[in-house]
């Protein structure tokens, strides 16, 4: 078990090291994609001068140099970035093909060599000679590696790139490209999505764009169709909180491009892997058959970003949409069969996530522990909170935003940020929040930090426990508050309620998702009560006994102070909670 776990972690690290060279530079790829779609001969605004002097040089020099610099920086900070760019330039100049792979090799390699040199030499430098040695060592080592890259790395990588390109073209010609989704879809759920998309498909796809103006490779991993189909199936045929929360998850997944949000829905029923694979196969087959492609990577994988990166004209946009919706239909059909044939009574998303977490821990040879928070989570021990994920953006940014709002409302002076796991620094007085699947890597990277693992960055109940711990509240007190809330909610009669209002602070996201969840439950049960959202600053407008305010444990006091006459439902999470179903059930008694 340990060998499998360590192998999995090593594969994740390798994939992450590749994606971490590309992800920070996605904006540059998008800028180049926009320039290409506008100024090449078949673009919206053909311009030979800009095509020759901007689009071409940016592809050949700027993008690979950015990758080389970033790869070096990730190894040895600024000095590593500089020597990474120098060495990468040698590979670029020594080849006629776009040297993304060469930059991915020379950037980290040259930075590692310089780092080892610095570790050996810097402690022996006499006072006053530091700048001289540092500058000349970087320059001379960089020069040597640049020449090596020009004569060796550039030509070798060019030949390898040509062979890979021939292989991809052969696969496309015999219509076998859809089979790639047999690997892609399960790999996404195992948090290798960024490694696949930005470590493999982005370099190869950019090469294709330079030749034919578009590439289907940009659509293989970014296609939101498979996840959309699964979420629609849960919305129609699911049970409990998995059903009610799927509507909000759909919005974040399809329009926000945060694909991680549908991963728990797949992991709670392993047969759902068949649904996303079916969706991926169908979508890629449709893309390939209709000749779909994008001009640059779509990051995040939002339908908005995908449409923005589609080539000129209605036709290219429509064929991309056709592939997305074909994938959604296929995954929906398979997921629907799985859900309708499932006779289990318990279909709680929270329960399934807990079971999944325990199964993962057992499969990694770890002890299955109770989900209590670490006793060291106090204001004396924690000075910063970092949400860490594979790429350091997307889902972790959403989680950081949610907790940052809670920290501010609690009056705590603690910074909350998000980073890629590979960029974490092992410092004390730090709380690292990461997904269970990535907890091993985060623990290895920062052994001195306090760690909290969640199955979903939107699982805000743990965030309330973190706030309770930081404000010197005991875990048992949090549990008592939850039990008190449940007892109080039993007294709420929807027959006496004329409106339901979800309260929010600065960020409105979770309140909007909760609003859509409750609306869905009301619609299914033919309840005609309007549901809306309101900021805490305007809750006084709803200070009446026939109004039900929905808030979280951390903000309960603020809601009661603003609207003392209103009825208040306090929940662990505005997004997924069993209290909504219980309210409706009591109404019909």
From Swiss-Prot:
It is found in: Cell membrane. The EIIC type-2 domain forms the PTS system translocation channel and contains the specific substrate-binding site. The PTS EIIB type-2 domain is phosphorylated by phospho-EIIA on a cysteinyl residue. Then, it transfers the phosphoryl group to the sugar substrate concomitantly with the sugar uptake processed by the PTS EIIC type-2 domain. This is PTS system mannitol-specific EIICB component. One of its GO terms (cellular component) is plasma membrane. Homodimer. The phosphoenolpyruvate-dependent sugar phosphotransferase system (sugar PTS), a major carbohydrate active transport system, catalyzes the phosphorylation of incoming sugar substrates concomitantly with their translocation across the cell membrane. The enzyme II CmtAB PTS system is involved in D-mannitol transport. It catalyses: D-mannitol(out) + N(pros)-phospho-L-histidyl-[protein] = D-mannitol 1-phosphate(in) + L-histidyl-[protein]. Residues 48-51, 159-167, 296-317 are extracellular. The active site is at 389 (phosphocysteine intermediate). The modification Phosphocysteine is found at residue 389. Residues 383-478 form the PTS EIIB type-2 domain.
């Amino acid at each position: 078990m340990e060998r499998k776990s360590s192998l999995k972690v090593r594969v994740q690290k390798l994939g992450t090291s590749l994606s971490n060279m590309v992800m920070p530079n996605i904006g540059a790829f998008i800028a180049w994609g926009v320039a290409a779609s506008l100024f090449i001969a078949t673009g919206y605004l053909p311009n030979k001068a800009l095509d020759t002097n901007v689009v071409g040089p940016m592809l050949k020099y700027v993008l690979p140099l950015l990758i080389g610099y970033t790869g070096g920086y990730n190894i040895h900070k600024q000095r590593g970035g500089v020597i990474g760019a120098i060495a990468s330039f040698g590979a670029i100049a020594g080849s006629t093909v776009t040297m993304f792979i060469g930059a991915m090799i020379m950037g980290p390699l040259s930075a590692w060599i310089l780092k080892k040199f610095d570790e050996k030499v810097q402690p022996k430098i006499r006072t006053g000679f530091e700048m001289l040695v540092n500058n000349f060592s970087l320059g001379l080592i960089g020069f040597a590696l640049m020449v090596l890259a020009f004569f060796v790395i550039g030509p070798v990588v060019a030949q390898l790139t040509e062979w890979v390109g021939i292989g991809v073209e052969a696969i496309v010609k015999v219509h076998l490209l859809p089979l790639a989704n047999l690997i892609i879809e399960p790999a996404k759920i195992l948090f290798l999505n960024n490694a696949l998309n930005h470590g493999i498909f982005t370099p190869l796809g950019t090469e294709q764009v330079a030749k034919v103006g578009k590439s289907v490779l940009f659509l293989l991993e970014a296609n939101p169709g498979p996840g959309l189909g699964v979420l629609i199936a849960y919305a129609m045929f699911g049970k409990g909180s998995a059903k009610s929360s799927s509507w909000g998850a759909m919005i974040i997944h399809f329009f926000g491009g945060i694909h991680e949000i549908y991963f728990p829905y797949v992991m709670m029923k392993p047969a759902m892997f068949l649904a996303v694979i079916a969706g991926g196969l169908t979508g890629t087959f449709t893309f390939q058959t209709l000749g779909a492609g994008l001009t640059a990577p779509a990051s995040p994988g939002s339908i908005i970003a995908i449409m923005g990166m589609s080539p000129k004209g209605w036709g290219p946009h429509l064929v991309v949409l056709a592939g997305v919706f074909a994938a959604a239909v296929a995954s929906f059909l398979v997921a629907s069969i799985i859900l309708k044939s499932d006779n289990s009574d318990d279909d709680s998303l929270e329960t399934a996530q807990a079971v999944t977490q325990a199964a993962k821990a057992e499969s990694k040879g770890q002890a299955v522990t109770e989900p209590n928070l670490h006793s060291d989570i106090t204001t004396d021990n924690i000075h910063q909170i970092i949400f860490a994920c594979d790429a350091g953006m997307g889902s972790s940014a959403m989680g950081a935003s949610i907790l940052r709002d809670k920290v501010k409302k609690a009056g705590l002076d603690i910074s909350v940020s998000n980073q890629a796991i590979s960029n974490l620094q092992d410092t004390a007085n730090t709380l690292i929040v990461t997904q269970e699947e990535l907890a091993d890597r985060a623990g290895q990277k920062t052994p001195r930090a306090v760690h909290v693992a969640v199955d979903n960055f939107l699982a805000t109940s743990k965030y309330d426990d973190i706030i309770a711990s930081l404000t010197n509240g005991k875990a048992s007190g949090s549990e008592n508050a939850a039990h008190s809330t449940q007892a109080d909610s039993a007294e709420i009669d929807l027959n006496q309620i004329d409106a339901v209002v979800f309260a929010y602070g600065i960020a409105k996201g979770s309140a909007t998702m909760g609003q859509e969840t409750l609306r869905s439950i009301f619609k299914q049960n033919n309840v005609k009560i309007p549901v809306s959202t309101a900021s805490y600053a305007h809750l006084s407008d709803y200070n009446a006994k026939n109004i039900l305010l929905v808030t979280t444990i951390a903000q309960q006091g603020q809601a009661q102070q603003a609207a003392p006459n209103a009825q208040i439902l306090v929940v662990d999470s505005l997004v997924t909670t069993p209290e909504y179903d219980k309210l409706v059930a009591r109404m019909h008694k």
